Design a protein with these regions (language model features):
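An amphipathic, basic-hydrophobic helix/alpha-beta surface used to engage anionic
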Residues: 1-130, 135, 177-180, 187-188, ...
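Von Willebrand factor type A / integrin I
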Residues: 1-33, 42, 51, 170-174, ...
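Short, flexible loop segments at the rims of nucleotide/cofactor-binding pockets, characterized by
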Residues: 58, 154-158, 181-182
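Short, glycine/charged-enriched secondary-structure capping and boundary segments
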Residues: 72, 95-97, 137-138, 193-195, ...
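Conserved phosphate-coordination/catalytic loops
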Residues: 100, 155-162, 248-251
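Short, contiguous clusters of charged residues that form electrostatic/catalytic patches at enzyme active sites
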Residues: 104, 108, 159-166, 255, ...
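Short, electropositive alpha-helical surface patch
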Residues: 132-147, 259, 287
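Von Willebrand factor
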Residues: 141-176, 188-190, 210
Length: 289
């Protein structure tokens, strides 16, 4: 993509997503995510009613009487966008590519973060960590992020969400809120990695998918290609049995995904590329209030 074309697209996305974050999401974002980051403040003597899980055993042993750690709400959050840049995101049959919607959602979240004086960073991942943008503040930083979202070229086309979660757990030393934006079409289980990551951080999953992945149209013979492996095959979509089997595969996959999120205690939302992601995000924020 030409530089002038990229800049026009950056500007167009900035105007749309900054308007959304200013006019719609500002209050909801604040109440949904503020107060979840707690920072150590001091130690004091144990008082009746204190949570015994907050006892500082080192200080208690030193003074031979119980002391507890005191925490206070962090004034600013660190927000990480974990963006899937694998080949399957370059797919779309209705309205836009999955990648385009992911870009807009990520930009909206970024502007919402900056509006609330939070830092924002990005992890681009495929089946490897493609790029890490450390969290910072400021409009210039966000415009750089949007430009990368639009024009980033990954080295790999495959997906490994487990690896991305493990990287987040290791690279982010302090607690952060991390949004995973993906279609979650990954053959490898990431349940354990998600559970571990969500103990340290606040993980939020946003699934973007195309309706034709969920339901095949009856258009006769169709050649389909796996965007990540390159494998191609012909299927007869005029067959009700073929369409039914494909739909059952999708339902089972979604059930497994929902179970993973539930067991990992991760909030999630799914949005189709032909739907309004604003409503989906508002539902997500409301769920967390």
């Amino acid at each position: 993509m030409e530089t002038s074309e990229i800049l026009k697209k950056v500007r167009r996305i900035e105007i749309k997503t900054r308007g959304l974050s200013n006019n719609i999401f500002a209050g909801q974002y604040h109440s949904a995510f503020k107060g979840r980051g707690m920072a150590f403040s001091e130690v004091r003597e144990y008082q009746f009613g204190d949570d015994i899980r907050d006892i500082d055993w080192n200080v208690t042993a030193r003074f031979n009487k119980p002391f507890v750690k005191v925490f206070e709400e962090e004034r600013e959050l660190t927000v990480m966008l974990m963006v899937d840049v694998s080949g399957s995101l370059e797919f779309g049959t209705v309205k836009q590519l999955k990648k385009d919607m992911v870009t807009e959602i990520a930009a909206t979240l970024a502007f919402s973060a900056i509006q609330n004086n939070d830092k924002i960073g990005v992890i681009f991942f495929s089946d490897r960590i493609e790029k890490f943008i450390p969290p910072k503040k400021g409009r210039k930083h966000i415009l750089y992020i949007i430009r990368e979202l639009i024009d980033f070229k990954p080295e790999s086309r495959r997906t490994n969400i487990r690896l991305a979660l493990e990287y987040l757990t290791n690279v982010m030393k302090r607690r952060c809120t991390a949004f995973i934006l993906s279609d979650f079409i990954d053959q490898e289980s990431f349940k354990n990695a998600m559970t571990i990551a969500n103990r340290k951080h606040d993980i939020v999953a946003i699934q973007v998918y195309d309706r034709r992945v969920a339901e095949l149209p009856a258009v006769g013979l169709m050649r389909i290609k796996d965007a990540e492996t390159g494998h191609e095959q012909w299927i007869d979509t005029s067959s009700a049995g073929v369409r039914k089997a494909h739909h059952e595969w999708w339902v089972n996959k979604q059930t497994e995904l929902d179970e993973t999120f539930t067991k990992s205690n991760v909030d999630s939302v799914s949005v189709r590329t032909d739907q309004d992601y604003v409503k989906a995000l508002l539902n997500l924020f409301a769920k967390r209030n």
